[in-house]
Amino acid sequence: GYLKADFTQERFHTDFTTWYLGWIASQVDLHDPAHHKHINPHQLLDNLADYDFPAYEGFLTSLGVSMHLSWHFGYFTRAQYPLGISLMADIIRSGAGKNPFWITEMQGGNVTASGREVLCPTAREITQWLWTGIAAGAEGVIFWTLNQRASALEAGEWGMLDFQGRPSDRLPAASEVARTAKAHKSFFRE
């Protein structure tokens, strides 16, 4: 009796996830073949072994990544968050293959209770994170979320708007990045 590493269960999980996502994509195609198919892996750095991104290229039309910094960036200090964004973007860009990749959940506002770390991004950080994602090749960035929920676990958190529904300083910062990227679209598409 020597101990041996047995990853049969983990391999099954990865293979089953790939099969199941492919099956879901086939069902979407059955009913709406023109519909885009996209997934948004959560906790990427902790769950990377669960995914077989190259296998997804055949049935997805784009690949995204969730970047809730207060959840997903425990390996980094706050000053290193741009490095974490770049790392996760590189992983997803590589995994997307010929398909585009998006940052489909970028933390947009404060988190005090529904994350692992208390964090309220500054307008400068939002600007830096967006440019880091764009420089890494992301075709788009979607924030979580525009406005805070009124109830439940995430109540009062994550929003780009303040508690009175007015833009926080983060929203105009994000808008300025979007305006600049749009004004120089050909440069960013090369």
Predicted regions and their residues:
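Substrate-binding cleft/loops of secretory-pathway carbohydrate-active enzymes
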Residues: 31, 36-75, 79, 110-122, ...
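Short amphipathic alpha-helical segments, especially helix-boundary/capping motifs
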Residues: 1-4, 65-67, 105, 152-156
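Short low-complexity stretches enriched in small and charged residues
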Residues: 13-24, 55-64, 151-159
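Active-site phosphate/pyrophosphate- and oxyanion-stabilizing loops and adjacent acidic/basic residues
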Residues: 26-27, 54, 90
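Aromatic-lined carbohydrate-recognition surfaces of secreted/lumenal glycan-active proteins
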Residues: 10-50, 99-110, 141-146, 190
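Short leucine-rich amphipathic alpha-helices used at interfaces
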Residues: 7-8, 14-15, 80-81, 86
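Short glycine/proline- and acidic residue-enriched helix-loop micro-motifs
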Residues: 2-11, 162
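Carbohydrate-binding surfaces of carbohydrate-active enzymes
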Residues: 77-190
